[in-house]
């Protein structure tokens, strides 16, 4: 096979190997994202949405890859032969860049594994790994051959040995896509949720805080002297550094450990500000120390699993920046939900997705 040919793999297989947030936005539109943002701001889990996106992409990509194997078997090229062809192409660098992800899957690798296991070198270590893989497939498949026997796919007889090459390749493809999806959705959802949250609370987004700015404003993903925060709210010479993490029970202390290093005073827009800290996490475990840890640094931690979490954020911002608490007169959950729903109509979601 000629892996220097951009058309040697199905177009959809190459396209699904890497997608962008713009691809997701174009596919679903802002109305879908508005519903998701509303759900998150009212206590639902964002992963209910992103997991479906991931599984859809996985199914489309896995089936396209599987179909590729079937087509090649019809041409008389076995999965094991494809494995060896891909190995040689990677070793000799005889491929175009766009084909690299699929070639790595064909040798049961991901880009991250290529970095970590092979140290980005397709040399002797790669040869040893390929030989050992072939030996292990032959050894392990013997224990299942009598039970499974010969497999028929698309009218093609497939030995269990060849089927092992297919499923290992699909496994690597799955690892790549799950890692890609986690990174993709995590990055833009942080900005989308925080941007929407602070906009409905009356703060204006600024790419950078300028000197002399007196309005209620916020920035996203700021970094100063290696102390990074996901957002910074500023007003009246005071500021709140915000860290958000879509991480589960047991890992939330990681977020607080990071933000606890922020200074109590910091220069923002050429002016020294009193700094407070707020951590937004997905859920707080029953035995988590994070609430007490936050209090020790005069900070606040809220969990997005709490239907009232937006009201708690509003109250904390009001107390620290001396601004109106827009939800103070809305103790009922239905009133909070109604406020959020109405306010989201005026939020430019596309702006925050594309940041």
UniProtKB/Swiss-Prot annotation:
Key word Nuclease present: yes
Phenotype caused by lack of the gene: Loss of restriction enzyme activity.
GO annotation, biological process: DNA restriction-modification system
Molecular functions (GO terms): type II site-specific deoxyribonuclease activity
Keywords: Endonuclease, Hydrolase, Nuclease, Plasmid, Restriction system
UniProt keyword annotation of DNA-binding present: no
InterPro entries noted in UniProt: Restrct_endonuc_II_CfrBI
Superkingdom of origin: Bacteria
EC number from the UniProt entry: 3.1.21.4
Coiled-coil intervals: none
Uppermost EC category: hydrolase
Catalyzed reactions per annotation: Endonucleolytic cleavage of DNA to give specific double-stranded fragments with terminal 5'-phosphates
The name this protein goes by in its record: Type II restriction enzyme CfrBI
Species of the source: Citrobacter freundii
Name of the gene encoding the protein in the UniProt record: cfrBIR
